[in-house]
Protein backbone atom coordinates (compact mmCIF):
# COMPACT_ATOMS: atom_id res chain seq x y z
CA UNK A 1 0.00 0.00 0.00
CA UNK A 2 1.32 3.45 -0.94
CA UNK A 3 -0.70 6.28 0.61
CA UNK A 4 -0.50 9.76 -0.86
CA UNK A 5 -1.83 11.70 2.11
CA UNK A 6 -4.21 14.45 0.95
CA UNK A 7 -4.09 13.52 -2.73
CA UNK A 8 -6.97 15.02 -4.73
CA UNK A 9 -8.74 12.77 -7.22
CA UNK A 10 -8.93 15.50 -9.89
CA UNK A 11 -5.15 15.86 -9.82
CA UNK A 12 -4.68 12.09 -9.88
CA UNK A 13 -6.89 11.78 -12.97
CA UNK A 14 -4.66 14.24 -14.81
CA UNK A 15 -1.37 12.89 -13.49
CA UNK A 16 0.68 11.01 -16.08
CA UNK A 17 2.75 9.55 -13.23
CA UNK A 18 -0.25 8.04 -11.44
CA UNK A 19 -2.11 7.06 -14.60
CA UNK A 20 0.98 5.29 -15.95
CA UNK A 21 1.87 3.52 -12.70
CA UNK A 22 2.17 0.10 -14.42
CA UNK A 23 -0.92 1.09 -16.38
CA UNK A 24 -1.30 -2.11 -18.40
CA UNK A 25 -2.15 -4.06 -15.24
CA UNK A 26 -3.73 -1.35 -13.08
CA UNK A 27 -7.36 -0.54 -12.38
CA UNK A 28 -7.99 3.10 -11.57
CA UNK A 29 -10.95 3.79 -9.27
CA UNK A 30 -11.88 7.44 -9.73
CA UNK A 31 -14.82 7.63 -7.32
CA UNK A 32 -13.80 5.99 -4.07
CA UNK A 33 -15.48 7.52 -1.04
CA UNK A 34 -13.51 7.68 2.19
CA UNK A 35 -15.15 7.02 5.55
CA UNK A 36 -13.43 10.07 7.05
CA UNK A 37 -11.84 13.15 5.42
CA UNK A 38 -8.80 12.91 7.72
CA UNK A 39 -6.11 10.29 8.05
CA UNK A 40 -6.42 8.20 11.20
CA UNK A 41 -10.10 7.22 10.92
CA UNK A 42 -9.79 6.92 7.13
CA UNK A 43 -6.95 4.40 7.38
CA UNK A 44 -8.52 2.44 10.22
CA UNK A 45 -11.63 2.03 8.05
CA UNK A 46 -9.53 1.00 5.06
CA UNK A 47 -7.58 -1.73 6.83
CA UNK A 48 -10.60 -3.09 8.74
CA UNK A 49 -13.21 -2.86 5.97
CA UNK A 50 -15.57 -1.31 8.51
CA UNK A 51 -16.79 2.17 9.37
CA UNK A 52 -15.37 3.85 12.45
CA UNK A 53 -18.80 4.35 14.00
CA UNK A 54 -18.73 0.57 14.55
CA UNK A 55 -15.03 -0.07 15.20
CA UNK A 56 -14.61 2.77 17.70
CA UNK A 57 -12.15 4.87 15.65
CA UNK A 58 -14.56 7.63 14.67
CA UNK A 59 -12.58 10.79 15.47
CA UNK A 60 -9.08 12.23 15.73
CA UNK A 61 -9.18 11.27 19.39
CA UNK A 62 -10.15 7.61 19.11
CA UNK A 63 -7.38 5.71 17.35
CA UNK A 64 -6.74 3.81 20.58
CA UNK A 65 -10.43 2.93 20.81
CA UNK A 66 -10.35 0.66 17.75
CA UNK A 67 -11.95 -2.59 18.90
CA UNK A 68 -9.47 -5.34 18.02
CA UNK A 69 -11.63 -7.88 19.85
CA UNK A 70 -14.43 -7.48 17.31
CA UNK A 71 -12.70 -6.31 14.14
CA UNK A 72 -9.72 -7.82 12.35
CA UNK A 73 -7.51 -5.70 10.14
CA UNK A 74 -5.87 -6.78 6.92
CA UNK A 75 -2.60 -6.77 8.86
CA UNK A 76 -4.08 -9.29 11.32
CA UNK A 77 -5.17 -11.55 8.47
CA UNK A 78 -1.85 -11.37 6.66
CA UNK A 79 0.17 -11.90 9.84
CA UNK A 80 -1.87 -15.04 10.55
CA UNK A 81 -1.12 -16.22 7.01
CA UNK A 82 2.65 -15.91 7.51
CA UNK A 83 3.21 -12.56 5.82
CA UNK A 84 6.04 -10.39 7.13
CA UNK A 85 4.36 -7.07 7.87
CA UNK A 86 6.02 -3.65 7.81
CA UNK A 87 4.78 -0.05 7.91
CA UNK A 88 6.29 3.41 7.77
CA UNK A 89 3.96 6.18 8.97
CA UNK A 90 4.29 9.81 10.13
CA UNK A 91 2.60 9.13 13.50
CA UNK A 92 1.60 5.99 15.37
CA UNK A 93 -1.97 7.30 15.67
CA UNK A 94 -2.88 6.66 12.04
CA UNK A 95 -2.27 2.91 12.00
CA UNK A 96 -2.53 0.36 14.83
CA UNK A 97 0.76 -1.38 15.64
CA UNK A 98 -0.85 -4.75 16.28
CA UNK A 99 0.67 -7.63 14.29
CA UNK A 100 3.32 -5.56 12.53
CA UNK A 101 6.76 -7.16 12.49
CA UNK A 102 8.33 -3.76 11.81
CA UNK A 103 6.66 -0.42 12.50
CA UNK A 104 8.45 2.85 11.77
CA UNK A 105 7.40 6.39 12.61
CA UNK A 106 9.20 8.81 10.31
CA UNK A 107 9.23 12.59 10.36
CA UNK A 108 9.44 13.56 6.70
CA UNK A 109 10.84 16.97 7.59
CA UNK A 110 13.89 15.40 9.26
CA UNK A 111 14.70 12.44 6.98
CA UNK A 112 14.99 11.73 3.27
CA UNK A 113 11.77 9.77 2.81
CA UNK A 114 12.73 8.49 -0.65
CA UNK A 115 15.96 6.99 0.66
CA UNK A 116 14.24 5.54 3.71
CA UNK A 117 11.51 3.92 1.63
CA UNK A 118 14.05 2.57 -0.83
CA UNK A 119 15.87 0.94 2.08
CA UNK A 120 12.61 -0.66 3.19
CA UNK A 121 11.97 -1.91 -0.34
CA UNK A 122 15.46 -3.43 -0.40
CA UNK A 123 14.75 -5.15 2.90
CA UNK A 124 11.46 -6.51 1.53
CA UNK A 125 13.26 -7.69 -1.62
CA UNK A 126 15.63 -9.82 0.47
CA UNK A 127 12.64 -11.39 2.21
CA UNK A 128 10.87 -12.04 -1.09
CA UNK A 129 14.00 -13.66 -2.51
CA UNK A 130 14.00 -16.00 0.49
CA UNK A 131 10.39 -17.01 -0.35
CA UNK A 132 8.90 -14.93 2.47
CA UNK A 133 5.55 -13.27 1.72
CA UNK A 134 5.45 -9.60 2.72
CA UNK A 135 3.07 -6.70 3.34
CA UNK A 136 4.40 -3.13 3.25
CA UNK A 137 2.62 0.16 3.92
CA UNK A 138 4.42 3.33 2.77
CA UNK A 139 3.03 6.75 3.65
CA UNK A 140 3.90 9.92 1.76
CA UNK A 141 2.93 12.93 3.89
CA UNK A 142 4.55 15.75 1.91
CA UNK A 143 1.25 17.27 0.82
CA UNK A 144 -0.12 17.13 4.35
CA UNK A 145 3.00 18.66 5.87
CA UNK A 146 3.11 21.42 3.27
CA UNK A 147 -0.53 22.33 3.87
CA UNK A 148 0.02 22.14 7.63
CA UNK A 149 2.85 24.66 7.49
CA UNK A 150 1.40 27.08 4.90
CA UNK A 151 -2.35 26.84 5.52
CA UNK A 152 -3.33 25.21 8.80
CA UNK A 153 -0.88 27.27 10.86
CA UNK A 154 -1.73 30.50 9.05
CA UNK A 155 -5.50 30.47 8.47
CA UNK A 156 -8.67 29.35 10.22
CA UNK A 157 -11.67 27.70 8.57
CA UNK A 158 -13.22 31.16 8.38
CA UNK A 159 -10.27 33.23 7.13
CA UNK A 160 -11.55 35.30 4.23
CA UNK A 161 -7.99 35.78 2.98
CA UNK A 162 -7.76 32.07 2.24
CA UNK A 163 -11.11 31.69 0.51
CA UNK A 164 -10.67 34.84 -1.57
CA UNK A 165 -7.38 33.58 -3.06
CA UNK A 166 -8.35 30.41 -4.91
CA UNK A 167 -5.62 30.80 -7.52
CA UNK A 168 -2.92 30.98 -4.85
CA UNK A 169 -4.45 27.98 -3.10
CA UNK A 170 -4.41 25.99 -6.34
CA UNK A 171 -0.79 26.90 -7.09
CA UNK A 172 0.30 26.03 -3.54
CA UNK A 173 -1.38 22.64 -3.72
CA UNK A 174 -0.17 21.84 -7.23
CA UNK A 175 3.45 22.43 -6.21
CA UNK A 176 3.01 19.96 -3.36
CA UNK A 177 1.25 17.45 -5.62
CA UNK A 178 4.12 17.67 -8.11
CA UNK A 179 6.50 16.68 -5.31
CA UNK A 180 4.25 13.69 -4.58
CA UNK A 181 4.44 12.71 -8.25
CA UNK A 182 8.25 12.85 -8.10
CA UNK A 183 8.15 10.56 -5.07
CA UNK A 184 5.90 8.08 -6.91
CA UNK A 185 8.09 8.21 -10.00
CA UNK A 186 11.09 7.35 -7.81
CA UNK A 187 9.25 4.46 -6.12
CA UNK A 188 8.16 3.16 -9.53
CA UNK A 189 11.79 3.13 -10.68
CA UNK A 190 12.89 1.27 -7.55
CA UNK A 191 10.12 -1.32 -7.92
CA UNK A 192 11.44 -1.89 -11.45
CA UNK A 193 15.03 -2.05 -10.25
CA UNK A 194 14.21 -4.57 -7.52
CA UNK A 195 11.79 -6.56 -9.70
CA UNK A 196 9.05 -6.35 -7.08
CA UNK A 197 6.10 -6.16 -9.47
CA UNK A 198 5.87 -9.89 -10.07
CA UNK A 199 3.36 -11.71 -7.85
CA UNK A 200 2.53 -8.44 -6.08
CA UNK A 201 -0.56 -6.36 -5.41
CA UNK A 202 0.47 -2.70 -5.30
CA UNK A 203 -2.08 -0.02 -4.48
CA UNK A 204 -1.48 3.72 -4.75
CA UNK A 205 -4.26 5.66 -3.05
CA UNK A 206 -5.24 8.77 -1.16
CA UNK A 207 -6.75 8.66 2.31
CA UNK A 208 -8.71 11.88 1.77
CA UNK A 209 -8.74 14.87 -0.55
CA UNK A 210 -8.00 18.52 0.15
CA UNK A 211 -10.09 21.68 0.08
CA UNK A 212 -8.66 24.55 -1.94
CA UNK A 213 -11.35 26.95 -0.82
CA UNK A 214 -14.33 25.43 -2.62
CA UNK A 215 -16.52 25.64 0.47
CA UNK A 216 -16.30 28.33 3.14
CA UNK A 217 -15.67 26.70 6.50
CA UNK A 218 -12.98 24.23 5.40
CA UNK A 219 -9.47 25.43 4.58
CA UNK A 220 -7.94 21.98 4.16
CA UNK A 221 -9.78 18.82 5.24
CA UNK A 222 -11.63 17.18 8.12
CA UNK A 223 -14.40 19.73 8.69
CA UNK A 224 -17.00 19.08 5.97
CA UNK A 225 -18.33 16.25 3.78
CA UNK A 226 -18.06 17.77 0.31
CA UNK A 227 -16.51 16.15 -2.76
CA UNK A 228 -13.15 17.90 -2.58
CA UNK A 229 -12.21 16.00 0.59
CA UNK A 230 -14.25 12.77 0.62
CA UNK A 231 -13.82 11.62 -2.99
CA UNK A 232 -10.48 9.84 -3.34
CA UNK A 233 -8.62 7.62 -5.82
CA UNK A 234 -7.20 4.12 -5.82
CA UNK A 235 -4.88 2.63 -8.43
CA UNK A 236 -4.88 -1.15 -7.96
CA UNK A 237 -2.06 -3.08 -9.67
CA UNK A 238 -1.74 -6.82 -10.13
CA UNK A 239 -0.21 -8.66 -13.07
CA UNK A 240 -3.37 -10.74 -13.51
CA UNK A 241 -5.53 -7.65 -14.11
CA UNK A 242 -6.11 -5.67 -17.28
CA UNK A 243 -6.20 -1.89 -17.28
CA UNK A 244 -9.48 -0.06 -16.97
CA UNK A 245 -10.91 2.94 -15.17
CA UNK A 246 -13.88 2.26 -12.93
CA UNK A 247 -15.94 5.40 -12.51
CA UNK A 248 -18.69 3.73 -10.46
CA UNK A 249 -18.88 4.69 -6.80
CA UNK A 250 -16.93 2.43 -4.46
CA UNK A 251 -15.89 2.89 -0.82
CA UNK A 252 -12.53 2.78 0.89
CA UNK A 253 -13.91 -0.01 3.11
CA UNK A 254 -14.29 -2.18 -0.01
CA UNK A 255 -10.57 -2.60 -0.61
CA UNK A 256 -9.76 -4.77 2.40
CA UNK A 257 -12.20 -7.57 1.39
CA UNK A 258 -11.08 -7.13 -2.23
CA UNK A 259 -7.44 -7.76 -1.32
CA UNK A 260 -8.34 -10.75 0.86
CA UNK A 261 -10.37 -12.34 -1.94
CA UNK A 262 -7.53 -11.70 -4.37
CA UNK A 263 -5.15 -13.52 -2.00
CA UNK A 264 -7.58 -16.36 -1.35
CA UNK A 265 -7.94 -15.54 2.35
CA UNK A 266 -11.38 -16.16 3.85
CA UNK A 267 -13.04 -13.77 6.29
CA UNK A 268 -13.07 -14.85 9.93
CA UNK A 269 -16.73 -15.30 10.90
CA UNK A 270 -15.81 -15.10 14.60
CA UNK A 271 -15.48 -11.34 14.15
CA UNK A 272 -17.99 -8.65 13.25
CA UNK A 273 -19.13 -8.53 9.60
CA UNK A 274 -17.63 -5.89 7.34
CA UNK A 275 -19.24 -2.80 5.87
CA UNK A 276 -17.14 -3.24 2.74
CA UNK A 277 -17.59 -5.80 -0.02
CA UNK A 278 -15.20 -7.27 -2.56
CA UNK A 279 -14.92 -5.24 -5.75
CA UNK A 280 -14.21 -8.22 -7.99
CA UNK A 281 -17.80 -8.46 -9.24
CA UNK A 282 -17.40 -4.85 -10.39
CA UNK A 283 -13.91 -5.48 -11.78
CA UNK A 284 -15.24 -8.50 -13.69
CA UNK A 285 -18.14 -6.51 -15.21
CA UNK A 286 -20.83 -8.45 -13.36
CA UNK A 287 -22.86 -5.26 -12.74
CA UNK A 288 -23.28 -5.56 -8.96
CA UNK A 289 -25.67 -3.23 -7.18
CA UNK A 290 -24.21 0.04 -5.97
CA UNK A 291 -23.74 0.33 -2.22
CA UNK A 292 -24.42 3.45 -0.20
CA UNK A 293 -21.27 5.26 0.95
CA UNK A 294 -21.10 6.74 4.45
CA UNK A 295 -18.76 9.47 5.67
CA UNK A 296 -18.54 11.33 8.97
CA UNK A 297 -16.25 13.89 10.56
CA UNK A 298 -16.02 16.35 13.42
CA UNK A 299 -16.39 19.99 12.38
CA UNK A 300 -14.39 22.08 14.88
CA UNK A 301 -16.48 25.19 14.08
CA UNK A 302 -14.94 28.04 16.10
CA UNK A 303 -12.72 25.75 18.18
CA UNK A 304 -9.02 25.20 17.50
CA UNK A 305 -9.40 21.46 18.02
CA UNK A 306 -11.89 18.97 16.53
CA UNK A 307 -14.70 17.58 18.68
CA UNK A 308 -14.50 14.13 20.20
CA UNK A 309 -17.53 12.85 18.30
CA UNK A 310 -18.61 13.33 14.68
CA UNK A 311 -21.10 16.12 14.05
CA UNK A 312 -21.12 16.28 10.24
CA UNK A 313 -22.14 13.20 8.27
CA UNK A 314 -23.14 12.16 4.77
CA UNK A 315 -24.78 9.23 3.00
CA UNK A 316 -24.61 9.00 -0.76
CA UNK A 317 -24.94 7.17 -4.04
CA UNK A 318 -22.97 8.03 -7.16
CA UNK A 319 -25.68 10.55 -8.09
CA UNK A 320 -27.13 11.88 -4.83
CA UNK A 321 -25.74 12.97 -1.47
CA UNK A 322 -27.46 13.77 1.82
CA UNK A 323 -25.40 15.75 4.34
CA UNK A 324 -26.55 15.84 7.96
CA UNK A 325 -25.08 18.68 10.04
CA UNK A 326 -25.84 17.60 13.59
CA UNK A 327 -24.04 20.60 15.08
CA UNK A 328 -26.76 22.98 13.82
CA UNK A 329 -29.56 20.53 12.97
CA UNK A 330 -29.55 21.19 9.22
CA UNK A 331 -29.47 18.96 6.15
CA UNK A 332 -28.30 19.32 2.57
CA UNK A 333 -29.27 17.31 -0.50
CA UNK A 334 -27.30 17.47 -3.74
CA UNK A 335 -27.83 16.10 -7.23
CA UNK A 336 -24.20 15.14 -7.86
CA UNK A 337 -24.80 14.25 -11.49
CA UNK A 338 -26.15 17.67 -12.47
CA UNK A 339 -24.63 19.72 -9.65
CA UNK A 340 -21.12 18.31 -9.04
CA UNK A 341 -20.01 21.48 -7.23
CA UNK A 342 -22.81 21.03 -4.67
CA UNK A 343 -24.22 24.52 -5.00
CA UNK A 344 -27.98 23.89 -5.15
CA UNK A 345 -29.36 22.45 -1.91
CA UNK A 346 -32.51 20.45 -2.73
CA UNK A 347 -33.46 19.51 0.83
CA UNK A 348 -37.19 19.55 1.62
CA UNK A 349 -38.19 19.81 -2.05
CA UNK A 350 -40.20 16.60 -1.98
CA UNK A 351 -37.71 14.33 -3.76
CA UNK A 352 -38.09 10.62 -3.02
CA UNK A 353 -34.31 10.14 -2.86
CA UNK A 354 -34.22 12.29 0.29
CA UNK A 355 -36.28 9.79 2.28
CA UNK A 356 -34.35 6.84 0.82
CA UNK A 357 -31.02 8.32 1.89
CA UNK A 358 -32.40 9.33 5.29
CA UNK A 359 -33.59 5.78 5.99
CA UNK A 360 -30.16 4.39 5.11
CA UNK A 361 -28.53 7.04 7.28
CA UNK A 362 -30.64 6.01 10.27
CA UNK A 363 -29.75 2.34 9.77
CA UNK A 364 -26.06 3.22 10.00
CA UNK A 365 -26.60 5.36 13.11
CA UNK A 366 -28.25 2.41 14.85
CA UNK A 367 -25.00 0.47 14.53
CA UNK A 368 -22.86 3.17 16.13
CA UNK A 369 -20.91 2.44 19.30
CA UNK A 370 -20.49 5.02 22.05
CA UNK A 371 -16.91 5.91 22.97
Where are the predicted features?
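Catalytic domains that recognize anionic headgroups
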Residues: 1-371
Amino acid sequence: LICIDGGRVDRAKNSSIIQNFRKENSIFFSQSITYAPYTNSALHALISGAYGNRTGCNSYWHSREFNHNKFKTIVDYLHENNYYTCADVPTNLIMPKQNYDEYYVSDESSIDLKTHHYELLCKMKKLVDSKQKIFLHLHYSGIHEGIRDTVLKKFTNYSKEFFENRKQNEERYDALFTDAEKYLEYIHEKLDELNLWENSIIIVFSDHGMSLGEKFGERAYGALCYESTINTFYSYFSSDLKHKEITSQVRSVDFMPTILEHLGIKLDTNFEPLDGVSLFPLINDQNPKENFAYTETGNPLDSKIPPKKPNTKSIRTSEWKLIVNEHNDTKELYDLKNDPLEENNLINTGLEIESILWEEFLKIQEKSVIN
